[in-house]
């Protein structure tokens, strides 16, 4: 628990201190965000707000993760694990794709960065590598970071995927989550606040898995997760970094995370869901992100098949703005919904454990 608190504190400190430095730097360089012309009129005043704030989030996560392990090693703790490094590697790779996308948007002074093919290839390459590596690095107990068995709150023994199918499944998960967070990042602080809650929920889940790991506490309800404590540190670092960034990203935002941050954070959810064996539960925890990306898919399908739109604008947080909700009202209500979803997800996780132990 001490390491988790250190991870949160370090990430928050780095993020909250580095972000204003980036604001000044990006403002001097003219790295301003372009706004969609067809977006809500109230967003036009945001044109020129510095972007690529995801750099501070990733820096906070990495400094926290490595710093916490340095402290842990000094106190006879363990070093970085394959699972933790794999999740962070995925997030960083996606963050690099997002950074390139953001940079092109800024250089060309328009809200279009990498073309769809290049961006998709970048995301798929990161996802493919993650899927392949997730089944490597078996420990003394034979556990790898990922499992070919589909998982809800733990592995579902009756649904085992062939290695190739598992890799393709990871590609779908990573692509879906990175795009989901990316679509959600359209209002000041919305994605950062929601991500902080989802990551906090994952801290509780992975720490409970650590306390009830089959490797150290065999018995009813134990969890076969390779590095649960290290995953808790990753989740704690991500939560802290998002909170620190939110200090500057809350309405009215002084900086946006850009695709640098949103794609990376989507990778965090995807990576944690695979390595903690909670792939289906993640849909509950990240219900807001799922709803946002679903609204985009529904809007596209409806328009292509009927010529009509379901929402005034997608993602659907803009729909509520266009029907008269203030931006801050949408943000706060969506945060509340995320808190409810995370509470429900943790309750489902704990309830399953109670059932497993016969309580």
UniProtKB/Swiss-Prot annotation:
Membrane-crossing residue ranges in chain numbering: 3-23, 55-75, 84-104, 120-140, 156-176, 187-207, 231-251, 255-275, 280-300, 334-354
Pathway assignment: Cell wall biogenesis; peptidoglycan biosynthesis
Top-level EC class: transferase
InterPro entries named among the record's database cross-references: Glycosyl_transferase_4, PNAcMuramoyl-5peptid_Trfase, PNAcMuramoyl-5peptid_Trfase_CS
Superkingdom of this protein's organism: Bacteria
Cofactor or coenzyme needed: Mg(2+)
Pfam families, per database record: Glycos_transf_4, MraY_sig1
Location in the cell: Cell membrane
Function: Catalyzes the initial step of the lipid cycle reactions in the biosynthesis of the cell wall peptidoglycan: transfers peptidoglycan precursor phospho-MurNAc-pentapeptide from UDP-MurNAc-pentapeptide onto the lipid carrier undecaprenyl phosphate, yielding undecaprenyl-pyrophosphoryl-MurNAc-pentapeptide, known as lipid I.
Its EC number(s): 2.7.8.13
Catalyzed chemical reaction(s): UDP-N-acetyl-alpha-D-muramoyl-L-alanyl-gamma-D-glutamyl-meso-2,6-diaminopimeloyl-D-alanyl-D-alanine + di-trans,octa-cis-undecaprenyl phosphate = di-trans,octa-cis-undecaprenyl diphospho-N-acetyl-alpha-D-muramoyl-L-alanyl-D-glutamyl-meso-2,6-diaminopimeloyl-D-alanyl-D-alanine + UMP
GO cellular component entries: plasma membrane
Originating species: Mycobacterium sp. (strain JLS)
Assigned keywords, A-Z: Cell cycle, Cell division, Cell membrane, Cell shape, Cell wall biogenesis/degradation, Magnesium, Membrane, Metal-binding, Peptidoglycan synthesis, Transferase, Transmembrane, Transmembrane helix
Annotated protein name in UniProt: Phospho-N-acetylmuramoyl-pentapeptide-transferase
Family, similarity comment: Belongs to the glycosyltransferase 4 family. MraY subfamily.
Membrane topology category: Multi-pass membrane protein
